[in-house]
Every structure is written in C-alpha cells, then in structure tokens.
Amino acid sequence: METLETRRLKLRQWSESDFINFARYYADEDNARYVGGKKDPDQAWRHMALQIGHWNLKGFGYWAVDHRDTNEFIGCAGLWQSPGWPELELGYWLVTEHQGKGYALEACVACIGYAREVLHAKSLVSYIDPRNAPSIRLAKRLGAAHEGSIELATYGSHCVFRHY
C-alpha cells in the first residue's frame, strides 16, 4: 500500500492503534448513519479488518488519514468496489472534531489522483445518501456531476456523482 501525502494530511496503511478512534466513530449513530450504521466494538473491529482486506483483494481501498502535524488519526478516505457495484467508488469519513476544515476535500483530491495516475481508472463515482448534504457539497466541490441514483444492497438508494 502506497502512502499518500498532502499539505496537511498523510494517507497511510492501517494499524491496530487506529481501532480506538475507528470504534469511537462507529459507536456514534450521528457519525455512522451514512456509512453503514452504528456498530458495537466487535462489529467495528470486523469493519476495520474489512477495510484492510479490501487492499489484498482488489489492490486498492481506504487509507487511514492522519493529520501530518500531529500524527493524529482523523478518519479515512479511499477507493472501494463491492461485488456487483458497477464502478470504482470514492469515499471518506472524518471524526467529528475534524469535519468542516477542508480535510475531506484534500484527502479526496489525493485519492482521485491515485485512481487516475496509478490505477488508470476510466470511471470514478461517489455513491452518496441523498440526506448527506455535506458529502453532496463536497462531491460538487470536487467537480462531480449528479447522474441519478442507484440501489445499493444493504445501503438503499444513493445518489450517483461522477468525478470527471
């Protein structure tokens, strides 16, 4: 797994020490409502392992995201493609205290660059819950265009935003 660095962030391989903040994020229903829902610690552990395993299965996935100045884990961002999903998806989440600071934009720009330059992705989308206004705004800031909706197993109807 390649490490990506931006002006303020480091996107890196997951470590066991990330679990505390990962589990804390998923324990909060407000945080987790758009990323599969609230999880108890055992479910969160399995979900973090899923993030790590995606790299082995597909050769890409989500990175753990640290703030470069503090080395603090602030969330994750990356690329995903579940079986049956027609395209590569760009996604992210940040712990509450780091939202609204432009970190998601910065991390997503790095992920888009990786998708285009390393994976040579011809197509990249974000599947966004229609109630998730902050993620819709971010997709638009990234230059993505709304293309309709898709029904995702276990997640329901989501807006499709295409990144050009």
Each model region followed by its residue ranges:
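Active-site rim helix/loop that mediates acceptor-substrate recognition in acyltransferases
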Residues: P41-G59
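Acyl-donor (CoA/ACP) binding surface of acyl/acetyltransferases
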Residues: M1-Y34, A49-G53, A64-Y164
